[in-house]
């Protein structure tokens, strides 16, 4: 059975913590491939101002170029409009099944989603299509996270895996602020991502 991970996010910009999470998920879950999915318009973040999708896609592509087990998809960007997780997972389930009939999907995201999931559309369908894989983010109480995990699993008849990872203190917001303040970011992002940011004068 082929095992595929999908890691979604705005990736504005992608940074080394994203790559670490994807790599650890691949290793711990024995994934054959991890697909990065730059978000289109997210329903719960529809009013946020984000960088041009083509540039965000280019940054992800540049960041993963040396990882043969990573790929990037422009599905949500090309689709346009609001991006709903159940639609994205259904698209990939069908696409992957055309190539590998025997497959399993894992949707990788931050554990903060456990506290907003009841606002998502078609949650039961999401769990019918994929196993949810969450990683802890700063500010989340571990006991609260585990309680929410059990509650969501029971309510939606789903399966959730919690990845035990080191927390890297890197955030896209901090990187954007550092660029705006003319501070170095080469400790936090791959060199080619930094090149794209400065060439296109992003986050100024």
Curated annotation (Swiss-Prot):
NCBIfam families registered for this protein in UniProt: cyt_tran_rel (TIGR00125), nicotinate (nicotinamide) nucleotide adenylyltransferase (TIGR00482), PRK00071.1-3 (NF000840)
InterPro entries: Cyt_trans-like, NadD/NMNAT, Rossmann-like_a/b/a_fold
Record keyword tRNA-binding present: no
Gene Ontology biological-process annotations: NAD biosynthetic process
Catalytic activity: nicotinate beta-D-ribonucleotide + ATP + H(+) = deamido-NAD(+) + diphosphate
Enzyme category, top tier: transferase
Lineage: Bacteria, Bacillati, Bacillota, Clostridia, Eubacteriales
Keywords on record: ATP-binding, NAD, Nucleotide-binding, Nucleotidyltransferase, Pyridine nucleotide biosynthesis, Transferase
PANTHER family (UniProt xref): NICOTINATE-NUCLEOTIDE ADENYLYLTRANSFERASE-RELATED, PHOSPHOPANTETHEINE ADENYLYLTRANSFERASE
Protein name: Probable nicotinate-nucleotide adenylyltransferase
Free-text function comment from the UniProt entry: Catalyzes the reversible adenylation of nicotinate mononucleotide (NaMN) to nicotinic acid adenine dinucleotide (NaAD).
Gene Ontology molecular function: any one: ATP binding
Pathway in which this enzyme or protein is active: Cofactor biosynthesis; NAD(+) biosynthesis; deamido-NAD(+) from nicotinate D-ribonucleotide: step 1/1
EC number: 2.7.7.18
Family per record: Belongs to the NadD family.
